[in-house]
Amino acid sequence: MTDTIFDYVIVGGGTAGSVLANRLSARPENRVLLIEAGIDTPENNIPPEIHDGLRPWLPRLSGDKFFWPNLTIHRAAEHPGITREPQFYEQGRLLGGGSSVNMVVSNRGLPRDYDEWQALGADGWDWQGVLPYFIKTERDADYGDDPLHGNAGPIPIGRVDSRHWSDFTVAATQALEAAGLPNIHDQNARFDDGYFPPAFTLKGEERFSAARGYLDASVRVRPNLSLWTESRVLKLLTTGNAITGVSVLRGRETLQVQAREVILTAGALQSPAILLRTGIGPAADLHALGIPVLADRPGVGRNLWEHSSIGVVAPLTEQARADASTGKAGSRHQLGIRASSGVDPATPSDLFLHIGADPVSGLASAVFWVNKPSSTGWLKLKDADPFSYPDVDFNLLSDPRDLGRLKAGLRLITHYFAAPSLAKYGLALALSRFAAPQPGGPLLNDLLQDEAALERYLRTNVGGVWHASGTARIGRADDSQAVVDKAGRVYGVTGLRVADASIMPTVPTANTNLPTLMLAEKIADAILTQA
């Protein structure tokens, strides 16, 4: 039985889904349905845990309230002597997705990222091809009149001006300048190494998610837009090799929804899982699970990217706490740094660091990640059950260059904190997982004296930064590993697109929120112009 008919059914109300729901429903003749498994987050009822933009760890202290419950993954690659335990992976399950729960840093990446996409077969996705969509999405409070920035988009972006930095932050900048890193001011228009006030998606001190920016009250009242939250897509409906709709569990009812086109925006773990359950993926894997093959696309679930990370923390001394309490609150948390490890001269700017001190938590921190990784992982289905999670292995540090980059990053941090401006605080730096920054780990200086212990610690404790991407990548039709074309259309079937971080050929040198906003804008434009 067919319950409802739409032109576009969007599966996943995260960052990308919010964009597409807005842009496609802007045309009154388009009947659009957005389906989200998690809760709604309307402007007048945003949970306080996710509203505070200056305390971005709060959602992670709320258990699985805003995340897919009990979703576990493997982070580190297999290695002799290293025990791998499944770890909880916080993937947003609420309107706005990752933009509602992750860090609020707004980073585009580097032009070379998108030129690389073009070289890998994503025609039209080079820097000049994506820049207009970065501009379209943003309302930059500091650089809105700059030709590289926008001043009229749905997402506000701002920074804490250096005039309002805390004394501790100023001391950190002095250490960085002594190490040869200049203030580049705008990380999204200057692409060399240096430090800067990070750009945030904030309105005042409030988080500004994609749902808040693209699904405000003026959009929600559109009669041609339907929003179903707390609803679970069970499967895609097919006729031959055509995708004709979705089966949805809504409350206690299972509904069959017909669509002219289905667009997957469920994220880099859930979107490929839906493809695989539909019979789109590596034929051998599908046969092994008894799933009829609709389209043999070996790249589905492969090419899984993530930024490897580690953290360093130290309890604040009395003087450090006092100095961290000055200036505007935002400046106490983070000072952004783009740096080069030197591991591979062909890929400079391969590290991204934050240095800060928070008088509320009583901790100084220096967290960083491999900004241009070389390791990739994969995901596979365990079974065909729509309620089962896929088996996910990020395979971090499988490429030895990434291990070298983490080591180099730790040595850079040691070098920065040894400068007189920071050394005066007498901070005892200890290792900590980025996913749960807390004191109590081994002292950094001790580990740096023992190469074997350092490597063992990194392989055991390496984290990610919730930047999963690449599992249904764009590419040319003759590329067996490509899953979608330049407009997000899935090869081998009709009526189906993917339009989230899954389609990234490589992970950008950036947090993935802004790139995901950009790509959703670009795919929406392609749909509306039928490119």
UniProtKB/Swiss-Prot annotation:
Per the UniProt entry, the effect of W466A is: 39-fold reduction in catalytic efficiency on vanillyl alcohol. In contrast to wild-type, is active on secondary alcohols, such as (S)-1-phenylethanol, and is strictly enantionselective as this mutant has no activity on (R)-1-phenylethanol
InterPro entries for this protein: FAD/NAD-bd_sf, GMC_OxRdtase, GMC_OxRdtase_N, GMC_OxRtase_C
pH dependence statement: Optimum pH is 8.0.
Q: What is the effect of changing H467A?
A: Abolishes activity
Q: Report the GO molecular function annotations.
A: FAD binding; oxidoreductase activity, acting on a sulfur group of donors, oxygen as acceptor; oxidoreductase activity, acting on the CH-OH group of donors, oxygen as acceptor
Applied uses, from the record: Because 5-hydroxymethylfurfural can be derived from sugars, the enzyme is of particular interest for the production of biobased plastic materials in an environmentally friendly industrial process.
The UniProt catalytic activity note for this protein reads:
5-hydroxymethylfurfural + 3 O2 + 2 H2O = 2,5-dicarboxyfuran + 3 H2O2 + 2 H(+); benzylthiol + O2 = benzothialdehyde + H2O2
This entry's Enzyme Commission designation comes to 1.1.3.47, 1.8.3.-
Q: Which cofactor does it need?
A: FAD
Q: Which residues bind FAD?
A: 15-16, 36-37, 68, 94, 98, 102-105, 233, 466, 501, 512-513
Active-site residue list: H467 (proton acceptor)
Q: Which UniProt keywords apply?
A: FAD, Flavoprotein, Oxidoreductase
SUPFAM superfamilies to which the protein is assigned, alphabetical: FAD-linked reductases, C-terminal domain, FAD/NAD(P)-binding domain
**Temperature remarks:** Optimum temperature is 55 degrees Celsius.
Q: Which family does it belong to?
A: Belongs to the GMC oxidoreductase family.
Other notes on this protein? At pH 7.0, phenylmethanethiol is oxidized to the corresponding aromatic thioaldehyde, benzothialdehyde, and no formation of 1,2-dibenzyldisulfane is observed, demonstrating that HMFO does not catalyze the formation of disulfide bonds. At pH 8.0, two products are formed, benzothialdehyde and benzaldehyde; this suggests that the thioaldehyde is slowly hydrated, yielding the aldehyde as the final product.
Q: Which PANTHER family match?
A: CHOLINE DEHYDROGENASE, MITOCHONDRIAL (PTHR11552:SF147), GLUCOSE-METHANOL-CHOLINE GMC OXIDOREDUCTASE (PTHR11552)
Q: How does it assemble?
A: Monomer.
Q: Write the protein's name.
A: 5-(hydroxymethyl)furfural oxidase
Tell me the organism: Methylovorus sp. (strain MP688)
